[in-house]
């Protein structure tokens, strides 16, 4: 998972901050509760430690994004985190919205085990799009 701005890759100095952003992208703009985010990002810590780790990761993520002028692509509300979907492009979203297979290359956030569910869904949709194109040809 990588994020680019004006053709350059954003440098995340903290892996958990980057993973938090990856979770938000994976959820496509859906609001994610602090509890749910803590479960996803947890490395087996107790709930309080996991929640504290989310707060730290959020702070670092926000600081990184602000340094690139991108602080508004994520938002935090009372007990939830979300992505401002209108402010970013994602190749997988484009594939799904436009029914075009050229956007998807068969990989999806391979560094995160929690992304395997979405990968299965994307592979299924990719095959459906290819099959439809073959039938239309």
Which positions does each model-derived feature cover?
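Intrinsically disordered, low-complexity protein-interaction/activation regions
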Residues: 1-137
């Amino acid at each position: 998972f990588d994020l680019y701005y004006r053709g350059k890759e954003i440098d995340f100095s903290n892996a958990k901050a980057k993973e938090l952003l990856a979770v938000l992208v994976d959820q496509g703009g859906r609001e994610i509760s602090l509890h749910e985010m803590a479960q996803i990002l947890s490395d087996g810590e107790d709930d309080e430690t996991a929640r504290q780790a989310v707060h730290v990761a959020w702070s670092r993520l926000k600081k990184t994004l602000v340094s690139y002028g991108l602080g508004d692509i994520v938002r935090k509300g009372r007990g939830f985190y979300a992505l401002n979907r209108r402010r970013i492009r994602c190749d997988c979203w484009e594939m799904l919205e436009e029914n075009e297979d050229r956007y998807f290359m068969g990989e999806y956030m391979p560094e995160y085990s929690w992304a395997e569910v979405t990968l299965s869904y994307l592979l299924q949709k990719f095959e459906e799009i290819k099959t439809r194109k073959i039938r239309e040809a």
